[in-house]
Swiss-Prot record:
Residues annotated as signal peptide: 1-18
Keyword set, alphabetical order: Endoplasmic reticulum, Membrane, Signal, Transmembrane, Transmembrane helix
Disulfide bonds: none
Record membrane topology: Single-pass type I membrane protein
Chain segments carrying region Disordered: 55-128
Subcellular location: Endoplasmic reticulum membrane
Keyword Membrane: yes
Domain of life of the source: Eukaryota
Stated name of the protein: Uncharacterized protein P19A11.02c
GO CC annotations on file: endoplasmic reticulum membrane; external side of plasma membrane
The organism of origin for this protein: Schizosaccharomyces pombe (strain 972 / ATCC 24843)
Record field: compositional bias (Low complexity): 55-65, 75-128
Segments passing through the bilayer: 224-244
Length: 244
């Protein structure tokens, strides 16, 4: 049973192989015929490129042919001297045409109109006007608009940091500071109160009264009396006794 199946399988394989071998129009060598085609194209381009360099020599040949054409005017000059026609033209000019030509010569008035046309063409004056329209005066104004004066003002305004030159007030008292109590006369060198004011360097600081500081005269200073000191000592002793 298995042997018969194997034989049928082998027969089927050989039939398929035979069918593919004898199929009309089926060849496996098609790809080998396509490969050698692109080779001869390189030789064609080199031959056509070398022949183009010979075109420059053909131009010089045509230029020599043009110079050789110059002699024909000599033959045409001979053809213009037709000796026979002038005799017939002499007869025709002695009849009517000269009178008409005299009339035409008297009508030479048109050149006057030609003179008028040349005078009307004069407007080069408008050309002079266009040159003056250039106004260079506005160009001068633009250069003066640069104003360097403002630049000078900014540079002179820079050195305002001169607070260190403000003089302190010595031996004085503020009125609003000490309202009651005893003044200490040993106070010297009171600091300036309005330190926010800034002076330029060009202005010397001379007026010291602008700092809102008034000096109290010596007669207004209240000195400590002996009775006041005794009262102070009694108050201190009573305070310590109370605390003890």
């Amino acid at each position: 049973m298995q042997f018969s199946v194997l034989c049928k399988f082998l027969l089927l394989v050989t039939a398929v192989m035979a069918q593919t071998e004898y199929t009309p129009g089926f060849t496996t060598d098609v790809a080998t015929t396509v490969t050698p085609t692109p080779l001869p194209s390189a030789n064609v381009t080199t031959t056509s490129f070398s022949s183009a360099s010979t075109e420059t020599s053909t131009h010089s040949v045509t230029s020599t042919n043009i110079t050789s054409i110059v002699p024909p005017p000599s033959t045409s000059h001979n053809s213009t001297t037709t000796t026979v026609p002038p005799t017939t033209s002499m007869n025709t000019t002695t009849t009517v045409p000269p009178t008409t030509s005299l009339n035409t010569t008297t009508t030479t008035a048109p050149p006057t109109t030609h003179v008028n046309s040349t005078t009307t063409v004069v407007p080069p004056t408008t050309h002079v006007n266009t040159t003056t329209v250039v106004p260079p005066t506005t160009h001068v104004n633009t250069t003066t608009v640069v104003p360097p004066t403002t630049h000078a003002n900014t540079t002179s305004f820079v050195p305002t940091t001169t607070e260190s030159s403000i003089h302190p007030i010595t031996t004085g008292f503020y009125n609003t500071t000490f309202t009651t109590g005893y003044f200490n006369t040993s106070v010297t060198s009171v600091a300036v109160h309005n330190s926010t004011t800034v002076f330029p360097t060009s202005v010397p600081i001379v007026n010291t009264t602008s700092f809102n500081v008034t000096t109290i005269p010596s007669s207004a200073v209240h000195y400590a009396s002996p009775s006041g000191l005794l009262a102070l000592v009694v108050m201190l002793i009573s305070a310590f006794a109370f605390l003890a």
